[in-house]
UniProtKB/Swiss-Prot annotation:
One of its GO terms (biological process) is ribosomal large subunit assembly. PROSITE patterns: RIBOSOMAL_L20. Pfam families: Ribosomal_L20. Belongs to the bacterial ribosomal protein bL20 family. Binds directly to 23S ribosomal RNA and is necessary for the in vitro assembly process of the 50S ribosomal subunit. It is not involved in the protein synthesizing functions of that subunit. This is Large ribosomal subunit protein bL20. Keywords: Ribonucleoprotein, Ribosomal protein, RNA-binding, rRNA-binding. One of its GO terms (molecular function) is rRNA binding. InterPro entries: Ribosomal_bL20 (IPR005813), RIBOSOMAL_L20_CS (IPR049946), Ribosomal_protein_bL20_C (IPR035566).
Length: 119
């Protein structure tokens, strides 16, 4: 029986990695070893940043809500507490969208929170 050297399998494996590394800078899209390392790092970055994105958006929403709340004479924490007391269940994403797009609706929510806080 003839010896099989596995050239087809090796080429397929290298080709797959180099295809994933397409568009990378410098040797990282040409040389197999550096491409493999960069692809592995890319998977790590993608995994990490999918979680980071959730934190970043939450921070952005809170910043926008805080700015709009202060324009209505409340701090962020006072607004959120007042909304909870008023049993208004609006998530931060929706609140931030209201703060940017519909200031009148946000003011109505802020007034409801103020009423429950006794301000």
């Amino acid at each position: 029986m003839a010896r099989v050297k596995g050239g087809v399998v090796s080429r397929k494996r290298r080709k797959r990695i180099l295809k994933l590394a397409k568009g990378y800078y410098g040797a990282k899209h040409i040389l197999f070893r550096t491409a493999k390392e960069q692809v592995m790092n890319s998977y790590y970055y993608a995994y990490r940043d999918r979680r980071q994105k959730k934190r970043d958006f939450r921070k952005l929403w809170i910043t926008r809500i805080n700015a709009a709340a202060r324009m209505n004479g409340l701090s962020y924490s006072q607004l959120m507490h007042g909304l909870k007391l008023a049993e208004i269940e609006v998530n931060r994403k929706m609140l931030a969208d209201l703060a940017v797009a519909d200031a009148a609706a946000f003011t109505a929510l802020a007034d409801a929170a103020k009423a429950k806080l006794g301000k």
